[in-house]
Amino acid sequence: MREYDITLFGATGFTGILTAEYLASRRAKEDFSLAIAGRNKGRLLGLKYELEKKYIGSEINILLADVDEEPSIRKMAEATKVLISTVGPYLLYGETVVRACVVSGTHYLDLTGEGSFVEQMELKYHKSANESEAKIINCCGYDSIPADFGTYFTIKNLPTTELKEVECFISVTSKDFTSAFSSISGGTWHSALGFMNLQEIERQRDMYAKILLRSRPREITVLPTEFRFREASKSFGIPLPVVDIEVVLRSALQLEEYGPAFSYGHFLSIQGLPKFLGSLLGFSLFLGASQIPPIKDLLYLLKKNGDGPNEEIRSTNKFHHSFIGKSGSKTVQVSVTGGDPGYGATSKMLGEAAICILNDPIPERYGVITPVVAMGDFLLERLQKNADMKFKVL
């Protein structure tokens, strides 16, 4: 008998606080016990007080756990049915938590965007997680819920037995450049700098190749990584080597709905030639600067871990994913929209995923699996009903 239904590890970090508040707000309707966990008892008590004051009758429990003290992580995992971790970077702090969940048969969720971490966890723990009947589900935030479920929604509107191709074009809107930069938390900024090196980008490409080698009997391919121009919207597409691609490909490998063959492309959508050229220049400068150790050290200083955008800035941020799906006999265009991608929407996606695993009759699939493979239509419904996401066929 587990003591808690859902435990949130890293609850006093920036995204952790937002997720804790969202979960506390949902307890009255969903009826689950909640614990918040971390290493700083004082901060946990402060958050507990604020949440219980705001949501009357919402009892919040506290667990002390530290990634540097593995017995405390094991104890935390053994005490709960579903464990959410917002403690990153996950390459540094994630494996201890995953391992504890695998051993104890505890379902695990995170919001990592670190492709190499996801790959390592699948290679190391998929078999043992399947044996212990643990669902290890990475990328349950903006990376990669919109891409994974947007693609899933798109292919559901195409004939099942035909070859399928999906292109995803993403855009994020903010009030202005200052607001856009302020919208990045310290943790996200540090993770991005860790990713932005040429070796990591090359490793990401190698990872896609490994996934493609697993694609029999279903053939899975990545669409050519070249710039796109969309005449209808006068917008340019820049190929993005991000974890979303890996997640979508893994979903396609495991589910029959994706058809006998499936191809996917993932692009950043930029409106107009001036912004397109400016974005290319900005990205090139950022990538170049991040290769020079002294400059990279200075870039790290621009954001502190724990920093993040205020509610006013978050309320101005929106995301939009446009999916173009094609099969032999049909073409469909899908729009997926939501609020502040980095934090507001992410906390809702993560929270709803945890509640979905706990309360919904989801498929009995275990191991290191994707959000779509784990939760499918059940989470798709929750995202639209509770997380302010809209999925539309245009």
List each language-model region with its residue ranges:
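Short helix-capping segments at alpha-helix termini
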Residues: R27-K29, L51-S58, A129, P159-T161
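Conserved Rossmann-fold cofactor-binding substructure of NAD(P)-dependent oxidoreductases
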Residues: L63-V82, T86-L92
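ADP-ribose/adenylate-binding Rossmann-like module
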Residues: P89, A100-V118
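N-terminal Rossmann NAD(P)H-binding glycine-rich loop of SDR-like oxidoreductase domains
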Residues: Y4-A24
